[in-house]
Amino acid sequence: MSSRNSQANKAAAREKLRAERERQAKKDRVRRQVIVAGAGVLLLAVVGGVAYLVKQANEPTYWEKAAKAELVKPKNTTGDDGTTVVLGKADAKKTLELYEDSRCPACAAFEQAVGEQVKKDVDAGKYKLRYIGATFIDNAAKGEGSKNALSALGAALNVSPEAFLDYKAALYSKELHPEETVDSFAKDDYLIKVADTVPALKGNAEFKKGVEDGTYDRWAMEMSKSFDKSGVTGTPTLKMDGKKIDTPSTPDAFTTAIDAALKG
């Protein structure tokens, strides 16, 4: 009797062990299936993420799209693409070419020192002023403020030549011109804030809409191309009769340089 009980107990133990092993094997299979499925989901997510990043990388940027958008030329411009901006009296015999980038600190220093004298000379008919806008600092310092400010200048030029000159002076003013590495001009609301210091632009709904809608973004890109084709490599640059004028830092030095160029 004792021997039979012992054999029965052993059989029961073996059956219990077998059942336990089957349960464990089943758990292991389920675990492996979960791991494989999870790895598959992760792989799909990674592949999908990579595909999305590749697609995004190949998508044109906002300004690349703007370069192919409809061209709207501001008033007070000439030329097929509206990038010839000449201000002043028609009977002025010579034209001063001024190359500037809105983010350029040296341009700001020049405008703060000499800008008012330039405006007086143009108003007096001493010479005409041709403006050529650049955007290369956006590439060098990263950002889009040069392009955005140039577009806003187009909106100001559409109002009037005087509004354009006053707005340009405000953009370069000591109070409102940011550091070269600070891309404040990339923000429409900042450009409108600057415009609020210009009587002809303050509260001007057409100007505001032109800035916010990017009406002159394509024009800004065309103007930038015009600068790139000019051969000028830095700003500010002044030219008269195709000859470069050393950039003066005071009104008196500017007048001396201009008078010499006018006689040349």
What do these predicted ranges mean?
Residues 102, 108-184, 188:
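Structural alpha/beta surface segment adjacent to cysteine/selenocysteine redox centers
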Residues 90, 123-124, 159, 230-233:
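Extracellular/periplasmic catalytic domains that process cell-envelope and extracellular macromolecules
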Residues 93-95, 125-128, 162-165, 202-203, ...:
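Loop/turn elements at helix/coil->beta-strand transitions in domains of secreted/extracellular proteins
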Residues 77, 172-185, 211-218, 253-258:
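Short secondary-structure transition/capping segments
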Residues 57-123, 133:
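Extracytoplasmic low-complexity, Pro/Thr/Ser/Ala/Gly-rich segments
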Residues 40-48:
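Core hydrophobic alpha-helical transmembrane segments of single-pass membrane proteins
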Residues 2-36, 49-60, 194-264:
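C-terminal cap of thioredoxin/glutaredoxin-like
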